[in-house]
Amino acid sequence: MGLLSEFKAFAVKGNVVDMAVGIIIGAAFGKIVSSFVGDVIMPPIGLLIGGVDFSDLAITLKAEGDVPAVVLAYRKFIQTVLNFVIVAFAIFMGVKAINRLKREEAVAPSEPPVPSAEETLLTEIRDLLKAQQNKS
């Protein structure tokens, strides 16, 4: 098996394709969460805290001579922590739902397989032979 055919077999496996789709959706979901936190969650929190504008939260260290001032923008850190919490919670809820579905599938009793016509015929023959042996 050549290198190219091995790569093709690897690339089209279901797990690799599923993983790629998951990464793409995850990246898009991350952008949605970032916008949600920055544009929807942070402004009301700032209002509740007392009119704090989170976009301006930073600590500026003094400049020394020709060296410009260093800005520690902790607003971005707070927003990133909130992004992480929201994404982690969404993943937790998704995993919890999947686990519940797996448990329901495991609990549901499976019906016994329907015997084939050949099995049914053999069972009838066996029963007839037993009945003949019991008569003699």
UniProtKB/Swiss-Prot annotation:
Pfam families registered for this protein in UniProt: MscL (PF01741)
Gene3D superfamilies: Large-conductance mechanosensitive channel, MscL, domain 1
Transmembrane segments: 17-45, 74-93
Domain of life: Bacteria
Keywords carried by this UniProt record: Cell inner membrane, Cell membrane, Ion channel, Ion transport, Membrane, Transmembrane, Transmembrane helix, Transport
Entries under PROSITE patterns matching the protein: MSCL
Cellular-component GO terms for this entry: plasma membrane
Membrane protein topology class: Multi-pass membrane protein
Presence of the UniProt keyword Transmembrane helix in the record: yes
InterPro entries: Mechanosensitive_channel_CS (IPR019823), MS_channel (IPR001185), MSC/AndL (IPR037673), MscL_channel (IPR036019)
Keyword Transferase attributed: no
Entry's Gene Ontology molecular function annotations: mechanosensitive monoatomic ion channel activity
Self-association state and partner proteins as the record states: Homopentamer.
Function text: Channel that opens in response to stretch forces in the membrane lipid bilayer. Forms a nonselective ion channel with a conductance of about 4 nanosiemens. May participate in the regulation of osmotic pressure changes within the cell.
Protein family (similarity comment): Belongs to the MscL family.
Protein name per Swiss-Prot or TrEMBL: Large-conductance mechanosensitive channel
Lineage: Bacteria, Pseudomonadati, Pseudomonadota, Gammaproteobacteria, Pseudomonadales
Name of the gene encoding the protein in the UniProt record: mscL
